[in-house]
């Protein structure tokens, strides 16, 4: 594993979040190792491998919220681990969780914990406030 500085890792994470804003699934997925394991709060099973991450995480969010922005609020780096507190801002333009597009803007806080090996994410834990997202979409009170 190559040594990673906090500056290098922050640039890597910013580029990863920029790929989300571009909403090109293949570009987002290029930041993950082939055998990546992602645990997303609210998703009942671990997402193991790029196909599972694409189908159950990347594609649902990029289709529903194209052009989404992750603003980094806090960044902590230690070795090959990084913790990012972020604000997700997007307009609901496509179906999400069986809900048709509402054209509503959402602002949802979240946090990601990633393990980075070389230049790829190998493991991730993603926490965000699902009830806040659904409330902002008009699905929950």
Feature locations, PLM:
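C-terminal and inter-domain tail/linker signature
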Residues: 1-141
């Amino acid at each position: 594993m190559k040594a990673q500085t906090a500056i290098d890792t922050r640039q890597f994470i910013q580029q990863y979040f920029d790929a989300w804003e571009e909403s090109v699934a293949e570009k987002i997925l290029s930041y993950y190792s082939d055998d990546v394991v992602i645990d997303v709060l609210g998703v009942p099973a671990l997402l193991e491998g790029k196909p599972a991450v694409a189908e159950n995480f990347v594609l649902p969010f990029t289709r529903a919220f194209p052009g989404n922005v992750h603003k980094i609020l806090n960044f902590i780096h230690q070795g090959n681990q990084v913790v990012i507190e972020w604000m997700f801002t997007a307009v609901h333009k496509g179906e999400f969780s069986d809900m048709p597009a509402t054209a509503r803007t959402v602002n949802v806080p979240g946090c990601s914990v990633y393990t980075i090996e070389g230049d790829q994410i190998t493991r991730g834990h993603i926490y965000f406030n699902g009830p806040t997202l659904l409330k902002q979409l008009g699905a929950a009170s």
